[in-house]
Amino acid sequence: MLNRFFTLTSLPPLLVVPFLGPLVERAHRKGLLILCDFGASALCALLLLFPGPPLPFLLAGTMLFHLLSHLFEIASKVLFSELCPPERLSSLNGIKSLLDHGAAVLAPAAGALLFGLCGFRAILLLCALAYGLSALQECFIPYAPRPIQQAEPPRLRAGIRYLLGRRELFSLFLLVMALNFFVANSEEIIFPGILVELYQFPESRYGLAVSASTAGTLLASLFLIRAAHLRPLEHLRALFLVNSALMAALGLAAPLLRSVPKLYFVLFFTFQLLIGWLTACINVPLISYFQTRVPLEQQGRFFALLAFFSGILIPLGISYTGVLADWLGPGAAYACNNLCVIVLVLLVRLPA
């Protein structure tokens, strides 16, 4: 039932995402952020005031919430490139990565604690207040929209032509999509398959092992804030190759080290720490590259296409990897997926 509800509420907004790009380019980006946060606050407040709504209203409200989230993500990336000097984008994106991943670590624990102490209505109240305060502080962002020179209104088809006509940009786009398809499914399929089913580690040890990647990402974000001058984008191919090689090695070692589970746990934790570090050193410069190299008049459509294909390929990758893991085993599936990424990295043209 929950899977059907998730599909019904997430798929329709996702299909609209490509058309949000032209809207973001036409509209006042700061105003869009305020609208999205205010709308999310209003939805939480309505659910708080009218508990137990009929299913059609709950479906419609959840779909609207997903749509607002997609719109906020696209508009915020474009606004970020408008407000920030190009030479500081990498370090500022490092700060954003640090805050995003820090919130991802703390929010579930804080939410579980609040739910246990005060119940679900307290969480709804907190969400309504948080979104409302976010909308309020966004009102004070100093913002003067840059003039966008366009011969005609922004159209989705023109955005697709722009992407296909830029070889380096399209190569990076393909690599991001490959990571979404082959690697983003790890926590849903690969890690439980290896650590829980194959090695039968307890939940506490599983949680510790998986958290190593987040710890590595947080450390890398701190590093990137201060070390943007090192220009990790210039070493992008090597970062991709080492990252995927570590993942493939973890997959290949899984069946080989079953007789020494403690050794595999230490290996998994150490490699995940490095993988989290390398992933941040790839993702943060990539976002900065897109924000500086894609013209402002194309950014809304570009980030909308990026969000759309990511949203499509991640669940497809989960389904594909589930079948592959049933056939080959989770370790071999992990290695196979990352070997595919390595081959693609070697074939495509990356920025020098």
Predicted regions: what is each one?
Residues 5, 95-103, 175, 305-310:
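Hydrophobic alpha-helical segments of secondary membrane carriers
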Residues 3-8, 14-41, 46, 55-57, ...:
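C-terminal transmembrane bundle of multi-pass solute transporters/carriers
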